[in-house]
């Protein structure tokens, strides 16, 4: 999971479908909690993947998982500031 919100969403998904073995792999890093008013809700986690930040006609697509998500979002913010969608 990318942040505490995703940990909670993953835990809820695991508990809702507890009929088989499941692993929740967590980072030892102190990850920032993403601003979910700026980025998409963690509820998309149940789909397996989801878009956190989108643009009308993207020039670049950044893909990340887990602890790398905050780095990808920082890159996204820098690209937007430079006028790259």
Language model segments and positions:
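TRNA-recognition modules of translation machinery and tRNA-sensing kinases, especially anticodon-binding
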Residues: 2
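Glycine-/acidic-rich phosphate or pyrophosphate-binding loops and their flanking alpha/beta elements
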Residues: 5-78, 82
